[in-house]
């Protein structure tokens, strides 16, 4: 199937009816829904036409109007600028309608007829205003999702499905979980309206395809496999994972093919099943190329080889373009599962380094990190920098990933592999090979069809046991090294206008910076992540870049990701969406609250990836490492009370604390111990781990009954109960709540749509949505809201249950 450029329908009201090109037989043009779209099959014109006819016929029958002709006469909504301002057939003159109305009204009192006409005109006016709304600049993606979810009229749903093409990709991507959940769990009319857009975007973006496939699988997991709705979601997922949605332009951009040596077609048997990279540029034209299923298993070397190439036209990529990326992700998940079986943090850390060292043997490859916001190829994982995070029962881990940014992931060649021990005598990019990776390098890349059901075949335990863990590399900085990284770090000092700064101010700021350099944490075998997380991000990037064989490349970037196995991140994704929406609302209303939503990738119902918050450590780690109170730690890190650094950090703390207090109140966030609250280098607090929100709580203990967590230590950092910053905190709380309730519908619909068909614990109980709406207090005046904020702050600060829960976490998990 080719990649079509879809021109979606426009819904423009007209002052006068437009005759149908097909005469009285109806034809295929339905200007309300499918203008300019019928030939491209975005929405089936006959389906949309029939839907609108049924809707309008129902309206006329209910209000004493004329039944629509059974011949399928096209209909058009008039925008209300005309005299009649009513819904009518395109080919029927208004006089005919009046004559038929007179006939139908025979024997009926004139008052009743006038009432029917008035109701019909009112309904026409409503239809006209709906059209005006859909075409106005006020109609944003949030309103489109709302109408798609709440409307019961197929014609409206079909139009909204077409309207999705007009919004920016990033705006629609934000609501992708809602769109796919509606596709899975709602009726066919909604699904039929959504599917054309999803298919079109999947042709355009491989990352969008991956996210759709993962979300469809995760949100279908709560349904019985035999149900029709589940099979419908499964069919779309299989379509995405197949090769049918691959962009057609790949066939036009094939590299030159040349026969490969025989050794390239007969790889030796090895434990790690490796096939040719999806970037293979040399394929034997005489080879027997077999087509494989969307997710086949490796049975032998011949099948593995044949699966690595589907046809000459498709040789630019793997037969299933998502297969290498899926193997990359599943390899990371398998590492987490194996780490969870080890008893100590030290053993987990050693095993993690060994596993990632093996993973590097398959890189570079046509794989990417889905949490990143730009196109790139993964080239290396600095395995010695990975750390295991704190968890009692599981083994989440943090890795850093070196990538090379590219313009287009699909068409850019996979970078050539550079050996770890290569002496980089030059930094010139021109000296690097421009072609794809060689045969030896391809042998170490990701198989396109791994056997996911047998970890021993995909990753050899024997190999891991024999692997010698590499020690951190020692590098000597050459002059060109220094010059390269100096250029990267220098910021432009040019300014259009001169800026005069007093010499005393410069001396004071320099002395403050030298006197209060951020402290480093000590290595703790029981908490190896503390040191890694405390290191400033820019320093980490510089250090890893200097030790990387790819670090000299100008498009080199460093990313990080947390891999979690055994945790359902669907609630985390829901919380991310709510936080992102609240952040947008507060920015729009100019309320200086600060929150930090971090990206979530749901891989399955029990695994996923999380974007780490850089330059931040947990309050638990702060207290354990420093043995100081929170206020004393602020003074140690940022200077005395009167320094500019401390005042800035204090303001950041207040603005972020107020923002997260409102988030915790609205979403009823639980499990708020100090291990789940981070403190960054600028003084902000960041709440993490939203596994218990709305109707769920840890082990249903019910410890945390306060509106949010506000401890005495937090108030001390703000300057005490009588301080100006504490009053500023309460003022921000009030302003933030007032702003949030102005846009309540935008927040509530995110949660309400995801409740459809969900078995998540946060939706247990029938009153989840009602209680969420009540927490916006729409009926209260601003004076009443101010009193409410005062009561919540006072109650949270004095809450005995918060102290009990902190004590419980200290006794059971050692969290300070």
Curated annotation (Swiss-Prot):
Residues 278-297, 306-318 have a biased composition (Polar residues). It is a peripheral membrane protein. Pfam families: PI3_PI4_kinase, PI4KB-PIK1_PIK. CDD domains: PI4KB_NTD (cd22246), PI4Kc_III_beta (cd05168). Residues 1-30, 101-120, 250-318 are annotated as: Disordered. Belongs to the PI3/PI4-kinase family. Type III PI4K subfamily. This is Phosphatidylinositol 4-kinase beta. It comes from Mus musculus (Mouse). The gene is Pi4kb.
